[in-house]
Amino acid sequence: MLTDIEISRQASLQPIESIATAFGILPHELSPYGRTKAKVDLAITNRIKDNKHGKLVIVTAVTPTPFGEGKTVTSIGLTQGLQAIGKKSCACIRQPSMGPVFGIKGGAAGGGLAQVVPMEDLNLHLTGDIHAVTSAHNLAAAAIDARLYHEQRLGCEAFREQSGLAPLDIDPEKILWRRVVDQNERSLRTITVGLGEVNGPVHQGGFDISAASELMAILALSRDLKDLRARIGRIVLAQNKQGDYISAEDLGVAGAMTAIMSQAISPTLMQTLSGAPCLIHAGPFANIAHGNSSIIADDIALRLADIVVTEGGFGSDMGFEKFCNIKTRQSGNAPDAAVLVVTVKALKSHNPDAGSEMDKLAAGYANLSWHISNVAKYGLPLVVAINRFAEDTQEELEWLKARVLQEGVFACEVCEAFTQGAEGAMALARAVVRATEQPSQFRYLYETKQSIEAKLLTIAEAGYGANGISLSDTAKAQLAQLQRQGFDKLALCIAKTPMSVSHDPKLKGAPQGFELPIAELKLNAGAGFITALVGKVMTMPGLGIRPGYLNIDIDERGEITGLA
């Protein structure tokens, strides 16, 4: 079979204007970036606001292996399958970060015959939204250090007289806003800023990957430009020497940050290999952020399509949980059904020494059972999609499907979208249509009015199967500060490893009885949630020993090779 990029390059693509017209987007609501992608103007929302509201399907997965289990392949394949059975469908996915593209995981355009194309456009830059997030974020970092430098250089009163601004009295030891870059770069996790006599007071800093920026979460959760501006103004950047929070509005940088992101607020329209529309917007990671594409993209798609397919990053303990408890709270768009993607290889990875291949599959089934139970907590009709790989045997697939159906899920189908495209996902599509016609009893896992500790305990015990939580001294102090400043009624975003339903990547299957260690609590006032860093989670990934960039090149005709 051809590689993903070879398939993408050989595809017969429609002009993006044709995709838009068929989907219901008018010419003046489109700003093309070349022939195959375009920004969708937010003015469309007023025109379509009274259209019938479509059905929303959230795609999630079991605990993944490092290379992923084909959740995006299944999402794109399902969208194509829905189109093939006569449903007007649209996929809403995140913009890939270039960190994983050049690292081990590769791109996030799907794969095989279930791709968003051109895949190289999607995986490299797209329409520049991540660059806008990065620039706006780092402007705030520069503004903090500049203010700190000038106030310390002049003294508060002289600064007030010369600048006409009120001193902020920033505590250099309590700057909360790190810098970001869209790369995996472990050497930047901890840095020293301000070295040299004229470069400002020396203090510790660091870089996160751009997908971890609060601005990325804000982009994904904003309803319009006005909301984006207000949220950016609420971002907490630092504390003053009295312990009070300093916001982007206080620093006077919120307007400029929003101006940088003014084009990024519009989603990008692309197409799948079968010509189905796909809206790409925002790219927060699910392990260190909330892991879902934008509310704006969903809102547009739901007023134009019969069924909208979106996905949450990693397993159901990660992006799906945050979709339900963070995104849905803010959007008001409750899902109508869920699809849980599983692979034979993922289940085998939980017990690789169990004996025969069937023994490994049976031993690893506990992980799938855990995720089925987890989705059930939210009251959604569930379809399990077995994403077939070439090495899967018929015996394994039949055993797995029969076992899944014993769990009481709505349906279970084998998906072969990777090798067959729309045709390989039609059975899944029909099952999903039937699932969306069932009554949904969607519910949240916790109420935001609970205390921070109570919410943490609920997520740990009901969400992960833990036996309680522990808070570090740092987390305890931060919790007290959040309560004191009135931020204790926000939703929670757990940042943890995606390789286990626990905090420990070595705990495979369906671990129980562990204590969830809360290392740090970080306020994301603009995004509207508190991030709890659990265990040893990193907000800046590193490159592996054989990174993906080693395979990537470009020839004299401008054709990229080796992009996965």
Curated annotation (Swiss-Prot):
Organism listed in the record: Shewanella loihica (strain ATCC BAA-1088 / PV-4)
Positions of ATP binding: T65, P66, F67, G68, E69, G70, K71, T72
Family, per entry: Belongs to the formate--tetrahydrofolate ligase family.
Family annotation (InterPro entries): Formate_THF_ligase, Formate_THF_ligase_CS, P-loop_NTPase
Pfam families in the cross-refs: FTHFS
Name of this chain's protein: Formate--tetrahydrofolate ligase
Native organism taxonomy: Bacteria, Pseudomonadati, Pseudomonadota, Gammaproteobacteria, Alteromonadales
Pathway(s) the chain acts in: One-carbon metabolism; tetrahydrofolate interconversion
Coiled coil residues, start to end: none
Top-level taxon in the UniProt lineage: Bacteria
Entry keywords, A to Z: ATP-binding, Ligase, Nucleotide-binding, One-carbon metabolism
One GO process term, biological-process aspect: tetrahydrofolate interconversion
Keyword Magnesium: no
Gene Ontology MF terms in the entry: ATP binding; formate-tetrahydrofolate ligase activity
EC number: 6.3.4.3
Swiss-Prot/TrEMBL catalytic activity: (6S)-5,6,7,8-tetrahydrofolate + formate + ATP = (6R)-10-formyltetrahydrofolate + ADP + phosphate
